[in-house]
From Swiss-Prot:
Keywords, sorted A to Z: Bacterial flagellum biogenesis, Cytoplasm, Repressor, RNA-binding, Translation regulation
Family indicated by similarity: Belongs to the CsrA/RsmA family.
Source organism phylogeny: Bacteria, Pseudomonadati, Spirochaetota, Spirochaetia, Leptospirales
Organism of derivation: Leptospira biflexa serovar Patoc (strain Patoc 1 / ATCC 23582 / Paris)
Transmembrane feature ranges: none
Protein name, as recorded: Translational regulator CsrA
Length: 79
């Protein structure tokens, strides 16, 4: 792991198009901003882990393709 020291309003570049900015420092809390292209997902680690867990659960379900078609039909009827 690369460890860098930064002060408020200083930044770190990752590649050519991702910038991490130190927005504010108060006590033991650091606020950071992330400037990245829209196609790059940015999540807090705990949120990312939850997303991964939910994706694993969803991948393990046994939904039949014909059931998905029926679900789509229900949505069409309501509009």
């Amino acid at each position: 792991m690369l460890v860098l020291a930064r002060r408020s309003n200083q930044s770190i570049m990752i590649g050519d198009d991702i910038e991490i900015v130190i927005v504010d420092i108060k006590g033991d809390q650091v606020k950071i901003g992330v400037k990245a292209p829209k196609n790059v997902s940015v999540h807090r680690a705990e949120v990312y882990k939850e997303i991964q867990e939910e994706n694993k659960k969803a991948a393990g379900t046994n939904i039949k393709p014909e059931d998905l078609g029926k679900l789509g039909d229900l949505f069409k009827k309501k509009t």
